[in-house]
Amino acid sequence: DYDKDMLIDSVIMKTSKKLKNISYPRLIMIIRGELKTYFIPNENNVKHRINRLIQLGYIKINDESKMYEYIP
């Protein structure tokens, strides 16, 4: 499970860094597309990983647009 969490984290960070702003549905679609050759991530686990990255200060939620933003 630890390896899966690290893979999910890396895709979230790579995607948010590349796009700067991203909606939740699009982020889920990209994560599943990137990881489908390894495993299909559980949506609850993805939500947990996003919340963890928010707590660590890597990404944040824009209150107006409800999109995730990369924090450089």
Where on the chain are the PLM-derived regions?
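Short, cationic-aromatic polyanion-contact patches
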Residues: E64-P72
